[in-house]
Amino acid sequence: MKKGLVLVGEPMGLLIAQSEGKLDSVCGYDLAVAGAEFNVAIGTARLEHKVTYMTKLGNDPFGKRIVSVLKQNKIGSEFVTFSKEKSTGFMLKGRTSVGDPDIFYFRKNSAASTLNETDVEKINLTKYSHIHLTGILPALSEDTKKAAFYLIKKAKEQGLFISFDPNLRPQLWKSEEQMKSTINELASYADLVLPGQAEGKILMGSDDEKLINKFYLENGAAICVTKCGSKGAYVSTKDNENYMVDGYKVKKVIDTVGAGDGFATGVVTGLMEGLPLKDAVKRATAIGAIQVMSRGDNEGLPTREQLNVFMNK
């Protein structure tokens, strides 16, 4: 069964500060591309899997750059469309040597926020074996929220393997309560849920990885893997498997943004290849470690050769 992965989401232009300092005082920025599902698409394609990505872009330089990156990485873009009225979203990202960088979004009323049920109905899900969704798509607008529910329910009906990463973006939601209820409802349709400990604290009231996993298994998932930062990840399955997978030590953390998407890439591609779950999660911790040593959101995502070298050191 080699059908490939389909993703739907919002990619953005990414302006990365060239020096440390507040975003309003930095003089220069480097241009890249970002977006949670976009990062997973790139990571999966670099590991030589068939990937298709759906989004809506503005007819602007950011949109054209995104299409160029999709083509460079051989990602299927037949479901990428352009809006005549709306622009591609973009974001500013600071540079820091300690903790997470400052981020500022320009994505309200973006082209991707107009994606709707009619758009996603065009995807013939029977052509794919896996779908990866995040909690960002339903946060963009009422239309994208309906589209996310349509997709995840349809994928469930069609028997695709569904992975879901909460990817919390509180600033995009009307309220924390709406965010929690929507994301936990979407997660109930997923086979695999990939929360972080801090996300667990918000979504179900605890940052204890064992309790987080218990919650999502009872919520409907077959597998829950909670990311525990540099410690690694805690795995639980409906078959009563429970274990920790240790993380990799890194020499220097440069940028933590994108590490979770790298982690998702590792688990999803591992399962697509039929690896045992523990090995897929070990791959995930490796890709997450590689990504935190890179400046951009997806530049560090490895090829198969680079991944093998890192894991066999």
Stretches found by the model and what they are:
Residues 1-76:
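Glycine-rich phosphate/adenosyl-contacting loop at the front of the ribokinase-like
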Residues 45, 71, 153-157, 187, ...:
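Anion (oxyanion) recognition and catalysis
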Residues 1-5, 153, 209-313:
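Conserved phosphate-binding/catalytic region of the ribokinase-like
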Residues 44, 196, 260:
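Short, conserved phosphate/pyrophosphate- and ester-handling motifs at nucleotide-, phospho-/glycolipid
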Residues 50-135, 308-313:
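Conserved N-terminal subdomain of the carbohydrate kinase-like
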Residues 159-166:
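Short beta-strand/loop segments at the ligand-binding rim of alpha/beta enzyme cores
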Residues 158, 170-242:
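Conserved phosphate/ATP/ADP-binding segment of small-molecule kinases
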